[in-house]
Amino acid sequence: QADCVMVSIHSHELGGLRKDVPAEFLVTFARACIDAGANVVLGHGPHVLRGIERYHGGAIFYSLGNFLFENDTTTHQPADFYEKYGLPHDAQVGAGMDCRSKNGTVGLGVNPNVWHSVVACWSMENGEIGLIKLHPITLHQELPRYRRGLPALTEDETVLHELAELCKPFGTELSIRDGIGYV
């Protein structure tokens, strides 16, 4: 008994070679969750946005991307992390991150798509998902390591236009008005 039943699924698996396309099993699973009574399925894991689908009165967010992205600012890592990069056990985490990313030239941190996302909110109407609003956020890839990764609303609509394209294969139309996406 709930006003809104939400299912959270963490999935890195790709649809083909594209990180922004969900694997087929995820589509099947998410739809089965709605069929079983969930109102919303919230996907996360690939660090990038994936499309949104309205399905049988529910909403499926195949991935909402990153809301926070502070991999480089953790205070501790396990011993094998330091061993992997040939660093002493008392090395700073940042030194390990620099080794892992080859000084910021490879890995997730160089992908601009992991540094922007949306905050989704919706209304409920007679037990079904009503209007979905999508507020674009930035995690400030351009800032120094110690300041990036925290979300802030942005007026840049680029992420909304990209998300609109990702929604099309699911038959979902995303419109943009005054810096907010609507589904």
Model-derived features: positions:
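Short active-site-adjacent structural elements
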Residues: 16, 51, 70-71, 130-131, ...
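A short C-terminal boundary segment appended to hydrolase-like catalytic domains
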Residues: 76-183
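Short coil/turn connectors at secondary-structure junctions
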Residues: 2, 56-58, 129
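Conserved, mostly hydrophobic/aromatic
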Residues: 6, 62, 122
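Active-site beta-loop-alpha junctions enriched in small/polar residues
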Residues: 10-14, 47, 65-67, 137
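Short acidic, glycine-rich surface-loop motifs adjacent to enzyme active sites
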Residues: 1-18
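Conserved beta-sheet core of the metallophosphoesterase superfamily
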Residues: 21-118
